[in-house]
Amino acid sequence: YKHLGGGALECIASRLSKTPKPLCFSLMVTSKCNCDCDFCFWKHKKGTDDMPKEEIIRLLTEAGQIGYMDSILWGGEPLIRQDFAEICKASHDAGLYTKIATNGWYLETNPDFAQYTDLMFVSLDAIGKAHDDIRHMPGICDKVISGIDYHKIHSPKMRIYVCCTVSTQTNFEQIKEVAKYCKDADILLYFTVNKAASIPEEAENVVATELENEQLSQMFVKIKEL
């Protein structure tokens, strides 16, 4: 039953109990990615070896046994893994409300994950070539939109959110276009902001794309008015 309603009722019940359960088990299943986003924390770690599938399945199984309620599977680009559907199945079978984060390139070529996934976050920072340029991946905007359309038809039980990263590489007009697309497609939209915070020396590329706090404040005032 925890897969119904986004697990909201169980989350509320857990928070109100004397022994609340841990909420979300976050797992980076690969560092590999076909994009080269300037604001990515992990772009310099693409050569790192991936955790074996068997180890990932063990961790997810134990997370379920411990009492975790949700999982979020991410990367890199998790759909690069040809065994990703098996990983999602392990999370689902462990009783976890299973979420994934993807750049959307492989949504149609590696689609089997969806039958075990409750919620998918897909990155879309602008519409058309502007998004391709931000992700340094020609054609990815078309792949995202086509992939979303595909899963709306073939995976109707999986909830879809669009994730728009706010940075120096996006402007309000581009964000408005993403918001219009989401409204027309009846998809929920949320925003992320990447900040290097305590490790600026390890993420100089992220620092270079950060908006100043005042700029962020002004941007989100405009976003709130959409």
Kindly give the residue locations of the regions a language model identified.
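Radical SAM enzyme [4Fe-4S]-AdoMet core and its adjacent flexible, acidic
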Residues: 94-97, 116-119, 123-226
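Short, flexible, glycine/charge-rich loop motifs used to bind or transfer phosphoryl groups or to couple energy/partner
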Residues: 15-16, 28, 61-62, 108-112, ...
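Conserved Radical SAM active-site core
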Residues: 46-101, 105-119
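Short strand-loop junctions, especially beta-strand C-caps/beta-turns
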Residues: 43-45, 76, 163-167
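N-terminal pre-core extensions flanking Radical SAM catalytic domains
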Residues: 1-47, 64
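Conserved Rossmann-like nucleotide-binding pocket used by diverse enzymes
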Residues: 25, 29, 72-74, 161, ...
